[in-house]
Amino acid sequence: MTMRKVAQRIPFTPSRTQAALLERCFGDRRFVYNQQVEAFNAYDKETNPNPEYPDVTGMKNANGWLRDSPIPSNALSNAIMDFRKARSAYFRKAQYGKHRPRFASRNDNIQSFRNAMPIRRMDGNRYPLSRKLGSVRIRKRDRLRYPIENLSSWTVKRENRTYCLVLLFDVDIQPKTRAEGRIGIDLGVKDLLTLSTGEKIDYPNRLRRLEEDVKREQRKLSRRTKGSNNYRRQRAIVAKAYAKLRHYRDNFQHQLSHRLIEENQFIGMETLMVRNMTRKARKRLDADGMPMRNGQSRKRAMNRSILRDGWSGLVDKLSYKAEWYGRILVQVDRFYPSSKLCHDCGHKYKGLRLSEREWVCERCGIPHDRDVNAALNIRDEALRLSREKA
């Protein structure tokens, strides 16, 4: 039996008293996290490689008001664990000069705290958070999908003035019945996915309309005076538009990945390096050292499309669902020339340009759709790698 972590998100509307308690919990969690960040800022590889980090007990002794907080003590410990994860990510990715832990702010659009020692029972249609925080009403449409006895932890989150309770369950997920399909997938900018069956899949038009809504609200924000009440109100509207876009894209990716996993036993994909693919265009200089045209505007537009379409999120969903449901997902090398190889005779068309969507093989004369041909080659190469590994 293999247990998996599965989350369920339940929106709720707290009472005025409960909302005030939750806001204090968010603030206390931020305080504990920021104390860790402040200690980390004293870190120096040469002079102070091991700064002293305060623990929960020490912070409660030094700050009596924290001892009376309605937040569960376990949630304060989880704030320290979250900081340690952020610190580990920083040291792991320090070569990029990013991901340094930063102070949490009360102005962040997302506020949350997590309790890993939950109550595993229901009071009718209400879930009790704790004695001090009270309970949350769960509506019929949000009824629990898994037994409450399997609850692992819960998180209360406020995102753009909307509260939600995220329940994390330990669930035994059974593999699905064996499917017959074997496909290759080519990710693209013009179409989100091209399958080796010839099917091309793109995001629905509604997603593009939501993107236009974000741009429109962002333009309005740029005209507001920073720090004014109008600016703060418009910033909340922009954050809400971004959240709506993100949730819609995430939901579409879940539906699409579920369908591909349901229909196919074997899936072949490219190995993606999104960080490298979305770098700026290299500078080009002429003989006199003056800058030349380097296609930076087109490269910038392509980078926006790659990041907007959320390739990494879709690949992650396919990966964990394939593992859950007993499917085989193989990723081919990122330098494999899937678009340039003729699927019928194996000839390599070295002069293929990005603007050429269709091409004819010089050796066998068979016409190819660039993306469908790439998906077929990815499928065959993934099958070959799978046989070698077996």
Please describe what each predicted stretch is.
Residues Q36, A79-Y90, V372-A382, S386:
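Stable alpha-helical structural segments in soluble proteins, enriched in small hydrophobic residues
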Residues M1-S77:
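Gly/serine-rich nucleotide phosphate-binding loop at the start of the catalytic core
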Residues V6, R16, A20, F31, ...:
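Positively charged, helix-rich recognition surfaces that bind polyanionic ligands
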Residues Q8-F12, V136-D142, Y146, I201-Y203:
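Generic detection of short hydrophobic beta-strand segments and adjacent strand-loop junctions
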Residues V37, N41-D44, R87, F91-K98, ...:
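Long, hydrophobic, amphipathic alpha-helical segments used as structural scaffolds
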Residues A7-R9, R114, G124, L133, ...:
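Broad gene-expression machinery/nucleic-acid interaction feature
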Residues R30-F40, A79-R87, V214, S319:
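Short, Φ-rich (hydrophobic/aromatic) sequence segments
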Residues Y53-K157, M292, R298, R304, ...:
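Acidic carboxylate diad motif detector
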